[in-house]
Amino acid sequence: MLETSQTIPELVAWTREREFALNLSTERLAFLLAIAIYNNERLDGEMLEADLVDIFRHISTAFEQSNDTIATRANNAINELVKQRFLNRFSSEFTEGLSIYRLTPLGVGISDYYIRQREFSALRLSVQLSIVADEIQRASEAAEEGGDEHHWRRNVFAPLKYSVAEIFDSIDLSQRVMDENQQSIKEEIAELLTKDWQAAIASCEHLLDETSGNLRELQDTLNAAGDKLQAQLLRIQDCVIGQENLAFVEQLITDLQAKLDRIISWGQQAIDLWIGYDRHVHKFIRTAIDMDKNRVFSQRLRHSIHHYFDHPWFLWTAQAERLVDMRDEELTLREEDALGELPEALQYESLADLHEQIVEHMQTLLIAYRERNEPINLSLVLKEQLAHYPLAKHFDVARIIVDQAVRLGLANDDLSGLYPHWEAINDHGAEVQAHKIDEYK
């Protein structure tokens, strides 16, 4: 990011004294972007007032505004951009009435953010990292050669400060643009699922997969170059250790290392966060599908509502009477002592003891899979183990098996977004939907 020697109070006072302010409506921003694009197409980078009026006329038409006062409104818009330092106006006695306009650094920066920064791609990142690698390579060779302070400032400090650091800042800014892009994609997915989730599934899958692929491709590019860049920076750092007169170079190296670490770290964190969001969306879609697998009820209900006036119908609801209302409040407790021994089938067995027995048995069973590096087919394991327990214990046993298996590892197919098939695990209609666990922790 931008480095400055000024403190926060100094910058605040400076801004207040000069009364800096930015106020760009949608129309004014569109006008500025149109000027920037037009300016890029010109070789000299200079524009006449007539050019700006023509551009404003196009903006006015796009916003469906009246053309009666086009000249006055264009003049006001140009003056506003000049006043807010988006444009510089040049005029002299030789060009009276023919002012020349050029975009200011502020105007270029804002328009660049909205136009060129969104063209972030793996190819652009590769080119940037290649330039950085060449600059750092030359700087490290110059550092190992050694020389006076002028040599260090010209051949080491200058390339790192004005080339490498600026490219790192550009990559950092591009990552922040991608963060904003992810938020817009999330909003688009939420809107699709809110309107019609059945029709939106394909679109959501495409958006999720495309974003995941872009993030991984860019992060792979960063990881491939990151270690080499850090090694070159360490070479330069070794050359300046212990030399107090080169403290400015050492400080710059430290800042560059921190920037590079931050870029790579946030890239990986962004992938992890997106994977979590991807799973959340898939879980929502899967739950919605499971609630009405064949969509028979939803389609029939939608059809009935649509044709209600042609074929009226009644909706009957039933609510079971609560058991508490059926209790006889006058019953008295029986306090007679029960003597003798209970049959073994009726003896009490605590849930904690049962849980410990099942956990110990399942740990022994599942660890054997990990030692042999064999995938765990949960549906098959559940079916084999539930056969040894009564039906009343099936739920607790299945929950313990799944909990122990998930602790051992995960299924790579979960990351692909593919849905596993439902498979029966007992003879009473219980089914499970799970991929094979094939990657152990």
Curated annotation (Swiss-Prot):
Query: To which protein family does this belong?
Result: Belongs to the MukF family.
Q: Supply the Gene3D superfamilies for this chain.
A: Chromosome partition protein MukF, middle domain (1.20.58.590), MukF, C-terminal domain (1.10.225.40), Winged helix-like DNA-binding domain superfamily/Winged helix DNA-binding domain (1.10.10.10)
Which keywords accompany this UniProt record?
Answer: Calcium, Cell cycle, Cell division, Chromosome partition, Cytoplasm, DNA condensation
Q: What is this protein called?
A: Chromosome partition protein MukF
Q: Could you tell me which NCBIfam families the record lists for this protein?
A: PRK05260.1
Q: Which residues cross the membrane?
A: none
The UniProt entry, under InterPro entries, shows: Chromosome_partition_MukF (IPR005582), MukF_C (IPR033441), MukF_C_sf (IPR038198), MukF_M (IPR033440), MukF_M_sp (IPR036141), MukF_WHTH (IPR033439), WH-like_DNA-bd_sf (IPR036388), WH_DNA-bd_sf (IPR036390)
Q: What does this protein do?
A: Involved in chromosome condensation, segregation and cell cycle progression. May participate in facilitating chromosome segregation by condensation DNA from both sides of a centrally located replisome during cell division. Not required for mini-F plasmid partitioning. Probably acts via its interaction with MukB and MukE. Overexpression results in anucleate cells. It has a calcium binding activity.
Q: Which residues form the signal peptide?
A: none
What is the protein's quaternary organization? Interacts, and probably forms a ternary complex, with MukE and MukB via its C-terminal region. The complex formation is stimulated by calcium or magnesium. It is required for an interaction between MukE and MukB.
Q: Which GO terms describe its molecular function?
A: calcium ion binding
GO cellular component labels: cytoplasm; nucleoid
Highest taxon of the source? Bacteria
The organism's taxonomy opens as:
Bacteria, Pseudomonadati, Pseudomonadota, Gammaproteobacteria, Pasteurellales
Question: What's one Pfam family here?
Answer: MukF_C
GO terms classed as biological process: cell division; chromosome condensation; chromosome segregation; DNA replication
Outline the segment boundaries, as ranges, of region: Leucine-zipper: 208-236
HAMAP family linked: MukF
Gene, per the UniProt record: mukF
Q: Where in the cell is it found?
A: Cytoplasm, Nucleoid
